[in-house]
């Protein structure tokens, strides 16, 4: 799974998308570089490193606490700090992840979100505040990779709550 995180039958689905052929070629070339013989190590103290199986070249910095609160309040005017939850944080982080993919390939943010789902990938927020796009089947394997990342860290900073990412 880690050597070829996106199976060929899913990659072939890109051919059916309404994308410029050059974009499909670039995506396929990048996906071919995705993966490693190094399996991500099981989570240690809530930390997991999926960088060896992340979509190459797709990364974005996530906002610090105040920037995140500001972005959430744009989506949810009047929300109190106490009412901020994992979903309201992920509304921001997932947008940032889809936008990073969209910017890399010159596609719409909606199309980027569709492609992430089409390829059975997921947006992963690292605990050091970055976005990675990783295989869903590895990310959701909680027996080895249950983790607390950016969402849990920000929630604790914003309102004192802490939720393991898998508990949402």
Model-predicted regions and their roles:
Residues 1-122, 126-168:
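Nuclease and nuclease-like effector domains acting on nucleic acids or nucleotide cofactors
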């Amino acid at each position: 799974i880690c050597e070829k995180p996106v199976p060929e039958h899913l990659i072939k689905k890109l051919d059916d998308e309404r994308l410029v052929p050059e974009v499909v070629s670039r995506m396929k070339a990048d996906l071919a570089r995705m993966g490693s013989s190094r399996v991500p190590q099981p989570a240690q103290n809530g930390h997991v490193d999926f960088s060896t199986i992340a979509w190459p070249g797709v990364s974005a910095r996530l906002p610090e606490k105040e920037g995140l609160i500001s972005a959430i309040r744009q989506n949810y005017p009047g929300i109190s700090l106490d009412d901020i939850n994992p979903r309201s944080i992920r509304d921001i982080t997932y947008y940032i992840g889809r936008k990073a993919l969209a910017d890399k390939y010159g596609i719409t943010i909606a199309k980027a979100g569709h492609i992430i789902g089409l390829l059975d990938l997921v947006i992963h927020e690292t605990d050091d505040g970055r976005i990675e796009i990783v295989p869903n089947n590895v990310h959701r394997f909680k027996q080895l990779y249950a983790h607390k990342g950016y969402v849990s860290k920000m929630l604790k900073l914003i309102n004192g709550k802490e939720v393991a990412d898998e508990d949402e």
